[in-house]
Amino acid sequence: MSAPSPYVWTFQPQRGTAAGASQDYSTRINWLSAGPELRGKVVQLNEARNAILMKEQESVPTPRAEANPSFWPAALIFQPRPQAIPVHPAHPDTFDAALTSNGAQLAGGAWINYKNGSVRYEAPLQLAEEQVGGPLNAFAIKHQLQLAGGALSASMSEMSGAPRIPRSGGIGSWQFSREFPPTVYLNPFSGSPDTFPHQFLSNYDSFSHTVDGYD
């Protein structure tokens, strides 16, 4: 008997909930081409995978009575504050300083002033036409580097995967990926039909808690 395939949860971004789970049949054995030796190796790999997933299931905290509620109060939503990501120059500081002193710039930038026969760059170093603001130089670029666009954004919430603040109707993809790992359900048909978890059915509606065609 082969190891059961894990159930992989699906994220519903409009509602901010888990939209049910379905089995990952990509791990199933092709019985037409698999011999006894290959079948045994695949079964061992699947059993090892299930052991890892079951251990992960036990370690995932679920501080709520219902694993997948249809409405998420704000107290149950984890909203991490995005951290700033400094961008360091690709070359040593001496190399960047030498290029700046010789008037090197990319795609626009400010004017270069000539004083006493030397070239001095007296504007914020940037990679676009728009000013980034603030007295910058090659040594302070790591916190102000930008690529062809507007001014720096004060928040990186659009890239963090966290829900926009304030939000009280659903979770974000960051929280979903950590609280809904692939689930291994052993012996799914050992009990009566009403004991089978509805969220593992492909036509389960997590919002109304009903199964299409059955309820």
Curated annotation (Swiss-Prot):
Modification comment: Cleaved by the viral protease during virion maturation. May cause the middle segment to be shed from the capsid.
Pfam families attached to this UniProt entry: Adeno_PVIII (PF01310)
Keyword Phosphoprotein: yes
Propeptide: 110-150
Positions carrying Phosphothreonine: 62
Keywords (A to Z) from UniProt: Capsid protein, Host nucleus, Late protein, Phosphoprotein, Virion
Induction of the gene: Expressed in the late phase of the viral replicative cycle.
Sites marked Cleavage: 109-110, 150-151
Gene Ontology molecular function terms on file: hexon binding
GO cellular component: host cell nucleus; viral capsid
Subunit structure, as described in the record: Interacts with the peripentonal hexons as well as the hexons in the facets. Part of a complex composed of the core-capsid bridging protein, the endosome lysis protein VI and the hexon-linking protein VIII; these interactions bridge the virus core to the capsid.
Miscellaneous comment in the UniProt entry for this protein: All late proteins expressed from the major late promoter are produced by alternative splicing and alternative polyadenylation of the same gene giving rise to non-overlapping ORFs. A leader sequence is present in the N-terminus of all these mRNAs and is recognized by the viral shutoff protein to provide expression although conventional translation via ribosome scanning from the cap has been shut off in the host cell.
Family to which this protein belongs: Belongs to the adenoviridae hexon-linking protein family.
Name the UniProt record assigns to this protein: Pre-hexon-linking protein VIII
